Swiss-Prot record:
Similarity field: Belongs to the Glu/Leu/Phe/Val dehydrogenases family.
Species the sequence originates in: Zea mays
GO terms for cellular component: mitochondrion
Molecular function as annotated in GO: glutamate dehydrogenase (NAD+) activity; glutamate dehydrogenase (NADP+) activity
UniProt gene name: GDH1
EC number: 1.4.1.3
Keywords of the record: NAD, Oxidoreductase
Main EC class the enzyme belongs to: oxidoreductase
Protein's name according to its UniProt entry: Glutamate dehydrogenase
Reaction equation(s) it catalyzes: L-glutamate + NAD(+) + H2O = 2-oxoglutarate + NH4(+) + NADH + H(+); L-glutamate + NADP(+) + H2O = 2-oxoglutarate + NH4(+) + NADPH + H(+)
Keyword NAD applies: yes
Gene Ontology BP terms: glutamate catabolic process
Length: 411
């Protein structure tokens, strides 16, 4: 089941639990706007290359639409649509005043030079600048993009609309980015994991963790969990996987990964097959890479007691059912990885106010938002006798539905 089908299925289950009117349900599912643009740029060798860019603006009942822009060769309309919809529910679960959006360009960023990436970003911004804005749609980094990408978007957008630092988040700090934003998603994963474990009388210290993915989210989650006393025993990335039952030295692994462009060859553990990582013996499994990695083919072999979805849609619905029967608790993506968009909100607020927060305030506010969101999800679980995923979806969908009705937008 692809990401769009799975997300729509979860939404429909939540709508049924909430008893939503069929017309309202239909209107909440249909995106506000779908944008598809051609982006043609001159390559460094003088040839022309064309790429297709997408932006799906799903819902704005609760505020400006919010979501990342990813550069990846497999970007397609269905994936962008699904991720935009997920952002709508995620911002509602976090209770920040945003709707959902997502964008992307079908390209392989590793095959493009820095100057080519800049030209591509600026052309894409030229095509969508009148459809995004501080109070309309606020992009952010995602897979294949970073703070530099946001700086280019800000600069290009400002040529048309005047200097507008709040038009994107995840910017460099020197251009109005927030302190703590780089680590925000990984730190949110830590806070969400702490909240879940505390419900069962446990803490981070002494728990065994396995993390799939060592990009921004996975590496920060690993560092922060290790600092909190957790034992990270196995990690993978696109280059390979490494395991040490006594716990990996995360600081050394970060250094090795930076110097060697991946964790392959790390001497502080034994190399293992990346495919076996998800089924390693552990207490907490954190998928922090691509979607759909936990499926009906490997769900029965998963030994973790808890799964924290740091990636978007890492667990297929079929696997969800299998794991539920096994008693595995899954903290869903729309709660577990909401730290990034929450601190993006803090950045947006700082830009609008023209007042910068210190990092301690950012992190303290993030802990408050994540912990409160977890408590709200648990309350929905009790009210509707459902699991954490449906608790999160019913919470998010209910908040968006109420805003839609209050604004008189229901069909």
């Amino acid at each position: 089941m692809n990401a769009l089908a799975a997300t729509s299925r979860n939404f429909k289950q939540a709508a049924k639990l909430l008893g939503l009117d069929s017309k309202l349900e239909k209107s909440l599912l249909i995106p506000f706007r779908e944008i598809k643009v051609e982006c043609t740029i001159p390559k460094d060798d003088g040839t022309l290359a064309s790429y297709v860019g997408f932006r799906v603006q799903h819902d704005n009942a609760r505020g400006p639409m919010k979501g990342g822009i990813r550069y990846h060769h497999e970007v397609d309309p269905d994936e962008v649509n699904a991720l935009a919809q997920l952002m709508t529910w995620k911002t509602a679960v976090a209770n920040i005043p945003y709707g959902g959006a997502k964008g992307g360009i079908g390209c392989s960023p590793g095959d493009l030079s820095i100057s080519e990436l800049e030209r591509l970003t600026r052309v894409f911004t030229q095509k969508i600048h009148d459809l995004i804005g501080i109070h309309t749609d606020v992009p952010a980094p995602d897979m294949g993009t970073n703070s530099q990408t946001m700086a280019w978007i800000l600069d290009e957008y400002s040529k048309f609309h005047g200097y507008s630092p709040a038009v994107v988040t995840g910017k460099p700090v020197d251009l109005g980015g927030s302190l703590g934003r780089d680590a925000a998603t990984g730190r949110g994963v830590l806070f969400a994991t702490e909240a879940l474990l505390a419900e069962h009388g446990k803490g981070i210290a002494g728990q065994r963790f396995v993390i799939q993915g060592f990009g921004n989210v996975g590496s920060w989650a690993a560092q922060l969990i290790s600092e909190a006393g957790g034992k990270v025993i196995a990690i993978s990335d696109v280059t390979g996987a490494v395991k040490n039952v006594d716990g990996l030295d995360i600081a050394q692994l970060v250094k090795h990964s930076a110097e060697n462009k991946g964790i392959k060859g790390f001497k502080g553990g034994d190399a293992i097959a990346p495919d076996s990582l998800l089924t390693e013996e552990c207490d907490v499994l954190i998928p922090a890479a691509l979607g759909g990695v936990i499926n009906k083919d490997n769900a029965n072999d998963i030994k973790a007691k808890y799964i924290i979805e740091a990636a978007n849609h890492p667990t297929d619905p079929e696997a969800d059912e299998i794991l539920s029967k096994k008693g595995v608790l899954i903290l869903p993506d729309i709660l577990a990885n909401s730290g990034g968009v929450t601190v993006s909100y803090f950045e947006w607020v700082q830009n609008i106010q023209g007042f910068m927060w210190d990092e301690e305030k950012v992190n303290a506010e993030l802990r408050t938002y994540i912990t409160r969101a977890f408590g709200n999800v648990k309350q929905m679980c009790r009210s509707h006798s459902c699991d954490l995923r449906m608790g999160a979806f019913t919470l998010g969908v209910n908040r968006v539905a109420r805003a839609t009705v209050l604004r008189g937008w229901e069909a």
